[in-house]
Amino acid sequence: MGMTITEKILAEHAGKKEVHPGELITAKIDLAMANDVTAPLAIKILEKYGIDKVFDPERIALVLSHFVPAKDIKSAEQAKIVREFVKKHGIKWFFEEGEGIEHAILPEQGLVVPGDLVVGADSHTCTYGALGAFATGVGSTDIAYAMATGEVWLRVPESMKFIFYGKLKPWVMGKDLILYTIGQIGVDGALYRAMEFDGETIRNLSMEQRFTIANMAIEAGGKSGIISPDEKTIEYVKQRAKRPWKVYQSDPDAEYHSVYEWDASQIEPLVAWPYLPSNVHPVSESTHITIDQAFIGSCTNGRIEDLRVAAKVFEAALKQGKKVHPYVRCIVIPASKAIYKQALKEGLIDIFMEAGCVVSTSTCGPCLGGHMGVLAEGERCISTSNRNFPGRMGHPKSESYLANPAVVAASAIMGRIAHPDEVVKAETLAGV
């Protein structure tokens, strides 16, 4: 029996010829990552046990991303702990506040390549699976162990395969494909399983949209999300990689827990209503819902393609004399400094600001209800982020709706959840 791409990567890193689902292994890692929320806990664990040396300062990445710029004294002290650890151990890959969100930075910097085994003290570490790597989130104790030893202990997951075929409708993006997937299988439908995505539709997606899909694998309970490398992957990696890579593909006779196959041409832009990412509805069934805030950003949809799509909608509105609805505040946060600079170069930031958006430095910010866009009681936000649990973006009685950047931009203009065609087609009809 053949192996899946996930099993091949894990076998290689465990020093075995093959591994099987359910098998417990100790595997060598290529990179350990933590942020300003999770790294201080790991650092305290290392100090508690008197561990004063990391396994390799060039194989650890620490990113200040969640509560930056520091929102209060506690978050400032958290960041200070990380900075002092970086200086003490000579950590090479340290990213200060404003550099961006880890799940945008690490691929940009070429710190994750195909065939890698990456562990990160953040649940959305699965994002890197878009590069054909096995990447998974772990707790601060596990990341402390990984930083000390260069190893991780885990159970080999079963794999599930999701095949999409057909041409996407206008305004349908990778975000809609992953929302559709979660809507079909539920938030525990892939519990501790590797979610492998394939099919002509996936192959036609940009790397940015593939990152979005892998990013939200955890929202279905997935241990990881992964897409086998192809020409697009290699082209992306060639320009960035800091070290050699190895391409793995699933064997034709690999065994899967289950295989799903869907016609993507039948999917329209979707919205996940509160309070689960699986509570998915078409935009056409959501247009009665008014909003107070719109957020475009996060590690899910804060990349340059996302900003371009949103800017297209805002630009169409501006040509009609429309801006962000007077009762709505719209926050745009590029996922990294590099993305911010590119957006400036392309004139996207000018469009956002002219349309009435607030544009901020790269940070996780409102996604986790941290700061820079926290919701009050009873407020509603439509967001390009990845979670909409009670209190996720602020008050426990606030509501978060998840959608792609085009839908969020259109909603910001209309003051309610809206299909992008309501703005962009209106421009065409008006002859503007």
UniProtKB/Swiss-Prot annotation:
GO terms for biological process: L-leucine biosynthetic process. The keyword Protein transport does not apply. This is 3-isopropylmalate dehydratase large subunit. SUPFAM superfamilies: Aconitase iron-sulfur domain. It catalyses: (2R,3S)-3-isopropylmalate = (2S)-2-isopropylmalate. It comes from Aquifex aeolicus (strain VF5). Heterodimer of LeuC and LeuD. [4Fe-4S] cluster binds at C299, C364, C367. Pfam families: Aconitase. It comes from the Bacteria. Pathway: Amino-acid biosynthesis; L-leucine biosynthesis; L-leucine from 3-methyl-2-oxobutanoate: step 2/4. PROSITE patterns: ACONITASE_1, ACONITASE_2. Belongs to the aconitase/IPM isomerase family. LeuC type 2 subfamily. Keywords: 4Fe-4S, Amino-acid biosynthesis, Branched-chain amino acid biosynthesis, Iron, Iron-sulfur, Leucine biosynthesis, Lyase, Metal-binding. One of its GO terms (molecular function) is 3-isopropylmalate dehydratase activity. The keyword DNA repair does not apply. Its cofactor is [4Fe-4S] cluster. Catalyzes the isomerization between 2-isopropylmalate and 3-isopropylmalate, via the formation of 2-isopropylmaleate. Binds 1 [4Fe-4S] cluster per subunit. Its EC number is 4.2.1.33. InterPro entries: Acnase/IPM_dHydase_lsu_aba_1/3, Acoase/IPM_deHydtase_lsu_aba, Aconitase_4Fe-4S_BS, Aconitase_4Fe-4S_dom, HAcnase/IPMdehydase_lsu_prok, Homoacnase/IPMdehydase_lsu, IPM_dehydratase_rel_enz, IPMI_cat.
